[in-house]
Amino acid sequence: MRKVRFRSRTEHTLDTKGRLNFPRRFSDVLESFESQDLIIAPFKTHLRIYPLAEWEELETKMHNHGGEQNLSGWVRYVVGGVVEAALDKQGRLLIPQTLRLDAGLEKNVVLNGMLSWIEIWDATAWASEQQAVRDGFEDFSEGLRNMGIL
């Protein structure tokens, strides 16, 4: 069976309680997992949403290698900041205020599928990130060649 992935991006508005309407195409992917539980993790400039199974794989990697290469501070930041979550009956996801503040999320956000997880960016930060990627696109050439894409 082919693994289903999170793809594409959508723009959303957080309501006054910090909830966002979770895109149907992302919830369809989530349904392919045994558990519908989600993990929301801080990631410096944005948040990441992981299906529980994907997060548990990442936790195993952190457990096995987190003490290497002086990563304990990063593990502390990410693991200490995670929140377990689930979609409500209306298909909304509550982003806790602590995580919204940590990632600088205002009212307008962008959800971006990253195959195994979803990113949540403040819309202004997303625009800056995208411009930086466009400006440095040639920097990806070697890696893309190594993967056989170029």
UniProtKB/Swiss-Prot annotation:
Pfam families: MraZ
Superkingdom, natural source: Bacteria
GO biological process annotation, one example: negative regulation of DNA-templated transcription initiation
Gene3D superfamilies assigned: Transcriptional regulator MraZ domain
Principal location class: cytoplasm
GO molecular function per UniProt: DNA-binding transcription factor activity; transcription cis-regulatory region binding
Keywords on record: Cytoplasm, DNA-binding, Repeat, Transcription, Transcription regulation
Presence of keyword Transcription: yes
InterPro entries noted in UniProt: MraZ (IPR003444), MraZ_C (IPR035644), MraZ_dom (IPR020603), MraZ_N (IPR035642), MraZ_sf (IPR038619), SpoVT-AbrB_dom (IPR007159), SpoVT-AbrB_sf (IPR037914)
SpoVT-AbrB domain location: 9-54, 82-125
Subcellular location: Cytoplasm, Nucleoid
Leader sequence segment: none
Gene Ontology CC terms, in alphabetical order: cytoplasm; nucleoid
PANTHER family for the chain: TRANSCRIPTIONAL REGULATOR MRAZ
Homology family: Belongs to the MraZ family.
Subunit structure: Forms oligomers.
Name recorded for this polypeptide: Transcriptional regulator MraZ
Organism phylogeny: Bacteria, Pseudomonadati, Thermodesulfobacteriota, Desulfobulbia, Desulfobulbales
